[in-house]
């Protein structure tokens, strides 16, 4: 029952060529620090007292809305603690510098090609909010577990997998009693893909993923900053990304923006979204490489923003595996670097992590696009931020770009 699993180190450590430095660095430091201690510490009276403290009702309740991955990304203090450099710094260096593209080193640490060997029943799942880590692995595993005797999926809403993960204990008990003790627990009743749509009520079911009732609608990235199925006047918009070491004390008021946003008009009715998402980006860049980081957002009537999902791409790794790709779900091999043709229009097919959400009437859908998300002002799901590509450029986005959203009609 690998809930919130990870199966491919490349997908965990980098996002289509962009190192997930906000997570992988403190994570490896934390593992290095904790692995250096024996059971003398972990079974000590001090740790027993801490466990007892966490089980007190008032403190325990606070963990109902905790997210372990976000906590790790925020623990900057870990970077100052001592840890054994072998193998943890070796692994960090391999991810950050030695293997920028998917190669044999990464493939040796990829379990996805082995999943079709699994024949036992498997129950997988995740919460929709775990966009930069566990969520994409869940769907990759679903595609590969083709020989499992019984494959079942649960896609949960916010805090559906609260740390320390108590929300699925009853479900797990029913699952294991069914298969290990032969008891009829009802866990197998109904369709095998079960999900919630955040902001909507109740559980839903499907016999397939993607959900067949959802169809892709193409939204143009209009020159006026709106997001609409009608492109309107053809044109473009430009934003600027600056690399490091420029010795500039502050931005200038004449600078182009560091990001672009496109927003739909207020929705006249609830809009349910579920499935794979793709940005078909047409852009020109004066540098040989850049990055595109996009965040899909829910904007309410008061202007409050909820980050829904995100997509990432190092432009030089844009090559699409057409045979493996589907409409709305491009597959990027990330094995071959191809420099951007300077100043020319290039079409990028960028996968955005599949997701689900009800955008309520009166709300708007917004797409935020930038190149560097290291700034605290830049939206980042779970605070997973990325190492910069390092180039400075003016990136021009054409209105012929399209955002493909899977809408339940």
Residue ranges and their predicted role:
Residues 145-159:
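Catalytic histidine neighborhood in serine/cysteine hydrolases
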């Amino acid at each position: 029952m690998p809930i919130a699993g990870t199966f491919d180190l490349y997908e965990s450590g980098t996002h289509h060529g962009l190192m997930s430095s906000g997570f992988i660095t403190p994570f490896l430091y934390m593992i290095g620090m904790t692995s250096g201690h024996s059971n003398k510490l972990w079974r000590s009276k001090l740790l027993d007292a801490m466990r007892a403290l966490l089980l007190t009702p008032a403190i325990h309740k606070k963990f109902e809305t905790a997210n372990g991955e976000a906590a790790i990304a925020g623990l900057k203090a870990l970077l100052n603690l001592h840890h054994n450099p072998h193998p943890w710094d070796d692994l960090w260096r391999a991810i950050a510098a030695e293997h920028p593209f998917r190669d044999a080193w990464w493939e040796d640490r990829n379990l996805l090609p082995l999943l079709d060997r699994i024949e036992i029943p498997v129950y997988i799942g995740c919460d929709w909010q775990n966009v930069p880590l566990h969520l994409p692995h869940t769907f990759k595993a679903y595609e590969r577990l083709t020989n499992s005797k019984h494959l079942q999926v649960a896609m949960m809403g916010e805090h559906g997998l609260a740390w320390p993960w108590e929300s699925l204990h009853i479900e797990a008990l029913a699952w294991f009693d069914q298969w290990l003790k032969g008891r009829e627990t009802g866990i197998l009743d109904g369709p095998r893909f079960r999900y919630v749509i955040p902001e909507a009520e109740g559980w839903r079911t499907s016999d397939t993923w993607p959900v067949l009732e959802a169809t892709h609608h193409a939204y143009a990235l209009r020159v006026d900053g709106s997001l609409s199925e009608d492109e309107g006047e053809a044109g473009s918009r430009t934003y600027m990304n600056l690399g490091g070491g420029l010795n500039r004390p502050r931005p200038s008021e004449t600078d182009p923006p560091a990001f672009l946003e496109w927003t739909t008009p207020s929705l006249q009715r609830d809009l349910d979204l579920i499935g794979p998402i793709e940005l078909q980006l047409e852009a020109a860049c004066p540098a040989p490489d850049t990055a595109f980081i996009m965040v899909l957002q829910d904007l309410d009537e008061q202007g409050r923003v909820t980050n829904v999902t995100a997509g990432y791409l190092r432009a030089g790794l844009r090559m699409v595996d057409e045979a493996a790709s589907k409409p709305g779900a491009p597959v990027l091999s990330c094995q071959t670097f191809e420099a951007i043709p300077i100043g020319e229009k290039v079409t990028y097919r960028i996968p955005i992590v599949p997701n689900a959400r009800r955008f309520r009437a009166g709300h708007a859908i917004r797409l935020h696009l930038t190149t560097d998300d290291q700034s605290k002002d830049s939206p980042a799901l779970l605070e997973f931020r990325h190492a910069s590509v390092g180039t400075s450029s003016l990136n021009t986005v054409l209105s012929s770009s399209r955002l493909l959203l899977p809408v339940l009609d």
